[in-house]
Amino acid sequence: MKQSVSAEQIELKSSLPGSKKVYVDGPREGMKVPMREIEQSDTNGVPNPPIRVYDTSGPYTDPAYKVELEKGIPTPRHSWILERGDVEAYEGREVKPEDDGVKVASKHTPVFPQMDRKPLRAKQGANVTQMHYARNGIITSEMEYVAIREGVEPEFVRKEIAEGRAILPANINHPEAEPMIIGRNFHVKVNANIGNSAVSSSIAEEVEKMTWATRWGADTIMDLSTGKNIHTTREWIIRNAPVPVGTVPIYQALEKVNGIAEDLTWEVYRDTLIEQAEQGVDYFTIHAGVLLRYIPITAKRTTGIVSRGGSIMAQWCLFHHKENFLYTHFEEICEIMKQYDVSFSLGDGLRPGSIADANDEAQFSELETLGELTKIAWKHDVQVMIEGPGHVPMHLIKENMEKELDICQGAPFYTLGPLTTDIAPGYDHITSAIGAAMIGWFGTAMLCYVTPKEHLGLPNKDDVREGVITYKIAAHAADLAKGHKTAHQRDDALSKARFEFRWRDQFNLSLDPERAMEYHDETLPAEGAKTAHFCSMCGPKFCSMRISHDIREYAKENDLETTEAIEKGMKEKAKEFKDTGSHLYQ
């Protein structure tokens, strides 16, 4: 009997403390855009307004929603897709045991109950990409939805997509996804990588990682599974994912040829693209820029080729002494992508894997090819973002952003960090967040998170949380630096709460309220400590903010400006010091 993945097998939590799910009505009937509303307490009887923030958690944090993973989540985009009249349902390819990396399907594999659904594709001669609509002056429902989430006009969204400066990854077979946008003129986004390996994890664990990552703020998910049950794992994830899902198709294609890179063929890869497009994958990482002539350049590197996809294609090219088939068949790939509106994430297969290799000839040679491929994709109205490094010291980061914008004509940049030093295994979420904040400020549109397990092992759900929060910090810091119009609102609210000793509001306004409260309560667990005018760092007598309050009260009582109060107060304290014998410690 086939098994199933149930909500009882994974940890699902309600909304974060002090928050509730709210919906903003869109311009069309039934369109409801989710937000998270953070309540605030009053200040001496004066109300503090609630703060609304971007929400990626999907229906899982809506108390009215009953989680039934075997049914998938709601499909708000389904009617929008059908009413445009340019898609058709068809039988689709047959799902085979080889898709899951086995010769015979296992009776113990939890098959998703609706795997026999009919996929959609563009009608003959039609193009269903958001870029195609945008270039034809059409503002889609997805664009209207995104405009509300970002606080901008729908026409601005349409223009950014039409010009290639932003992508709206939204496969027509992933109607569960809540539309979002990736572009440097919008909020900086964060991607979380999940996926099994040949030695670790189960389908239930990966579904849990997905719900966990989106709860903490992941804007997209990449399923990088390389073990068994790749197809089935992906089906469970997509049917329950409220955010876009990306993959690296070469991983599954390699499994289909028993892990032997030289046995890969265009036919196997093409079949894999169609398989994943029919499932609803929203963007593909495709390493079409790893050209045969670039591979010898990497021989003098400290760490060679560190990209899994890049090394697979390099091995194939060298064995056959032929050009990369992803490059030679790129136009055919575009034809597949535009039938389903799958976006390109052009892979940086030659990214530097060490500080010593940053900004070298191999890296920038590949970038030139990615610029060439971007033009080809845009000719087909297929959406494109560009993947970037990697390991780059701080003084070389800006050059990466400038070259990408120039060579790739402003297409969104999507970077892994970059890591700014190589000496901190176990802390690479920090070494990379430093670079991520910088490159986000310079213009990167999406940051791929790094967890503490980077270079060490497969991340678990706690590592996923740590990675997402760390990268939400970097992304928000970049938004602040870029002057995003709503970025300051939450900072200002938290600072006000901190100064007024509204401890619960401080916790609730933070990116990780549970962690903030946990750390506070380690030393001051009593409920009364939630209203105290100090914390355990300084205690009641040395709290700088309490002293600042005293100065303000002194000024108010003596009808003085704050500056005058400080000067007068200092004179009085100086006199008191002298009168008590000028002893430093009483």
From Swiss-Prot:
GO terms for molecular function: 4 iron, 4 sulfur cluster binding; carbon-carbon lyase activity; zinc ion binding. Keywords: 4Fe-4S, Iron, Iron-sulfur, Lyase, Metal-binding, S-adenosyl-L-methionine, Thiamine biosynthesis, Zinc. GO terms for biological process: thiamine biosynthetic process; thiamine diphosphate biosynthetic process. Its EC number is 4.1.99.17. Substrate binds at residues 193, 222, 251, 287, 307-309, 348-351, 387, 414. Its cofactor is [4Fe-4S] cluster. It catalyses: 5-amino-1-(5-phospho-beta-D-ribosyl)imidazole + S-adenosyl-L-methionine = 4-amino-2-methyl-5-(phosphooxymethyl)pyrimidine + CO + 5'-deoxyadenosine + formate + L-methionine + 3 H(+). Zn(2+) binds at residues 391, 455. Pfam families: ThiC-associated (PF13667), ThiC_Rad_SAM (PF01964). It is an enzyme of class 4 (lyase). Binds 1 [4Fe-4S] cluster per subunit. The cluster is coordinated with 3 cysteines and an exchangeable S-adenosyl-L-methionine. Residues 22-39 have a biased composition (Basic and acidic residues). Residues 1-59 are annotated as: Disordered. The keyword Membrane does not apply. The keyword tRNA processing does not apply. Gene3D superfamilies: 6.10.250.620, Radical SAM ThiC family, central domain. One of its GO terms (cellular component) is cytosol. [4Fe-4S] cluster binds at residues 535, 538, 543. Pathway: Cofactor biosynthesis; thiamine diphosphate biosynthesis. Catalyzes the synthesis of the hydroxymethylpyrimidine phosphate (HMP-P) moiety of thiamine from aminoimidazole ribotide (AIR) in a radical S-adenosyl-L-methionine (SAM)-dependent reaction. Belongs to the ThiC family. This is Phosphomethylpyrimidine synthase.
